C-alpha cells in the first residue's frame, strides 16, 4: 500500500493554486539582476496570458500496472513538469 500512497502523492504536482509575483495589483516587482515586471493575476494571467502546456519544461510521464503478492493488480499513471517562467496564473 505504501507504493500506491506514494504514487497518489505524486499524481497531482501540476495542480497548483493561482499565483502571481505582484505588488499592488499590477505594479512591477524587482527581483535582483534578473528583474521581471509581473502584473496581478487577472483574466489574462500575471504575464499577460494564461500558462500554456508549452510553458512547462522537463515534462515526464509514465503509466503501468503492478501485481501484489496477493494477486491484486493496480494501475498507475503520473506526469510532472516544471514551469520555467517567473510570472503567470493558472
UniProtKB/Swiss-Prot annotation:
This is HssA/B-like protein 4. InterPro entries: HssA/B-like_chaperone, HssA/B-related. One of its GO terms (biological process) is sorocarp development. Belongs to the hssA/B family.
Amino acid at each position: 500500500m505504501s507504493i500506491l500512497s506514494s504514487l497518489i502523492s505524486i499524481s497531482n504536482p501540476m495542480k497548483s493554486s493561482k499565483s502571481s509575483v505582484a505588488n499592488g495589483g499590477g505594479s512591477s516587482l524587482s527581483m535582483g539582476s534578473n528583474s521581471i515586471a509581473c502584473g496581478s493575476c487577472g483574466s489574462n494571467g500575471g504575464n499577460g496570458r494564461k500558462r500554456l502546456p508549452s510553458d512547462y519544461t522537463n515534462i515526464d510521464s509514465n503509466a503501468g500496472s503492478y501485481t501484489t503478492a496477493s494477486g491484486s493488480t493496480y494501475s498507475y499513471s503520473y506526469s510532472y513538469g516544471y514551469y520555467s517562467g517567473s510570472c503567470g496564473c493558472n
